[in-house]
Amino acid sequence: VRARWAVRALLAGVLALAVLSGCAQSVDPIERLGKKAAQKVRASHEPHRGKYRRWGLAAPLAPAPRPVRSPDYGEDPAGAGLPPVLDHVPTRDKVVFLTYGADAERDPRFIDMVRELRLPVSVFLADRAVGPGYARAARLRAAGAGIENLTVGHTELRGLSYAEQRAEICGQQERLRSRLGLHPRLLRPPYGAYDRTTLQAAADCGMAALILWRRMPGRDPESYERGGPLHPGDILRPHVQPREEESRPSVPLTTETARLLRRIQASGLTVARLEDYL
């Protein structure tokens, strides 16, 4: 009998300890789920940690400061009420701006790069060059890219009539509105070519500015300047030329962008969103 009571007492003690330990169970994921599971939980809150190395960067991009006031563009040489034409933003902030055209859709990894690095890029789209149903444009937007106007047909505007230029600019505004629900405020004239009629048509279509890019005399006008130092406020256009008779570029856009990002970091600069400064 005594042995039976001793067994019962021992079982009761074990049960009491189990209840107490259950009530005092820690909510720390390291104790509750185990160290390996807890590391997975914590990692999910830092999805972009270390991704910069995947894209060939030694360190993540520094966060861009928020502009405290709108830049002063000075006198409007084109006339009152017409949008300014910019190849740089007058700012002392240590930032530059990355802008792209249709080549942003040609490199399938570019969308991943924008999302993982949280690149504040601006992509100018022409209806002629956009993929079916604007699907990739929608993915670019979801990844964080700003979507702006590059006209309907990517046609050189300079020399066209007012009606023709307005149709190109306003027509693409309508397409971006109907397909993506957007109302872009920035226009990039194809090939950087424009005239006073372009400015008037752009103003009538609701454009706030015409955006060019930093050039270098004697170099490829479609490319950003490769030599010389970068300056705060530079508007850059990473660009790669497709191989002859091929739709894919000879150098992936992600490779060219990573090369430029390393140069930006080496210059003590970072990338800011162009729309935040305009």
Predicted features and spans:
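C-terminal motif of bacterial Sec signal peptides marking the signal peptidase cleavage site
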Residues: 19-22
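C-terminal domain-boundary segment and adjacent tail
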Residues: 81-91, 130-131, 251-278
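CE4/NodB-like, metal-dependent polysaccharide N-deacetylase domain
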Residues: 115-116, 120, 146, 162-195, ...
